[in-house]
C-alpha cells in the first residue's frame, strides 16, 4: 500500500491540485474518496487530518498536511528531483526562484480571487443548493469578470515575453491555475480567454500535459445532484 494518501473527492479543485502534482512527479499514492454531500469531511476522523474540516487531507507515513498549495510544494520537494522536475525553480538560481514565487503569489492573490466567484456562482452554488437550479448572482459574476479581464491583460503582457509565467519553462506557478480555470472553461464565460491569445495558447499548452489530462478526466463538466462522480 502506498504511504501517500489523499483524502477527498477528485472533482474538488483543491483535491485536484494535489493529485495533479502527484501525477506530475509520478509518485505512487492512494486516493481515499470522501462524500462531501454527506458531510464526511466534517467527521472527527477527517478533522484530525484537516482541522478546518476541508478537503483534501494528506498523509505521508506519520506526516499529516493540509492546505493544497502547501501539500503540492511538499510533493515537489520530496519527489520532484527523482522525477527530474524543478517546478519550484529551487535548482535554477535565485532569480528564477523569485519569479516562480512572484507568479505563485499572483495566482493565489490576484487570479484566484477574480476567477473563483464565477465558478462558484455558475457551478458550485447551483450544485449544492437543495433542489438545484439556483440562478447565478449576475452582479457578482460581472464584477468578477471585470477583475479577471484586468488580470488576464497583465498575463497577456507577461506571456508576450516568456513561454510560461515564470520564464520559458513550466513551473508550479503555471500548474496551480489548472483546477479553477478548468471549471471556468465550462461556464458561459469561457470566451473571455479569446481576447487574450497568448493566455489562451498558454492554457492550451497546460491542458495538453498528460498529468493534467489524467486529473481532469475526473473533473465533471456538468454537475447533477445524485450523479456518481
UniProtKB/Swiss-Prot annotation:
CDD domains: GST_C_Phi, GST_N_Phi. Changing residue 171 to S: In strain: cv. Fidel. Its EC number is 2.5.1.18. Keywords: Transferase. The keyword Transport does not apply. Residues 2-83 form the GST N-terminal domain. It catalyses: RX + glutathione = an S-substituted glutathione + a halide anion + H(+). GO terms for biological process: glutathione metabolic process; response to toxic substance. Gene3D superfamilies: 1.20.1050.10, Glutaredoxin. GO terms for molecular function: glutathione binding; glutathione transferase activity. Changing residue 226 to R: In strain: cv. Fidel. Residues 93-223 form the GST C-terminal domain. It comes from the Eukaryota. Changing residue 195 to E: In strain: cv. Fidel. PROSITE patterns: GST_CTER, GST_NTER. Conjugation of reduced glutathione to a wide number of exogenous and endogenous hydrophobic electrophiles. Belongs to the GST superfamily. Phi family. This is Glutathione S-transferase 1. It comes from Triticum aestivum (Wheat). The lineage of its organism: Eukaryota, Viridiplantae, Streptophyta, Embryophyta, Tracheophyta.
